[in-house]
Amino acid sequence: IEVNKVCYMLSELVEQLPRNVRRGKIYFSIMHHPANSVRNEASVSIGYPFSSKSNPYARVGTDSFDFDSGVQMDADPSWAWLRNPAHHDRLIDMMKRGNQLVFKGTSARGTLTTDTYSLLGFSKALARLNQACPPV
């Protein structure tokens, strides 16, 4: 195992609401870090600092997945991670079967944003990710 090897895949959004809000980099990611036994870790870069009161979540189909913001975790305030690691595989399964992922969060300024990501090609990209960083 390459000790520091980390593999990830990114998806850029296809729609953001509201449209007139200036934001930094916005993307959803799935990461593997084999040396730490981390697989399918879901995170999002939202492009703004989250509000400390924000309850960010992702929705795929009718299933919702709660995230913790970097503000809540004393980490980068513009990132969020899936709250319950036991839900990573369920989220991945839903992303394989779904058409889109919708992520919602609230900025430190109080703006609620809704970002939509296409899941077209997700299964193929995940297969490449698994090939690059197989489980140990």
Task: Identify the function of each model-found stretch.
Residues 1-136:
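A generic "folded-domain core" signal
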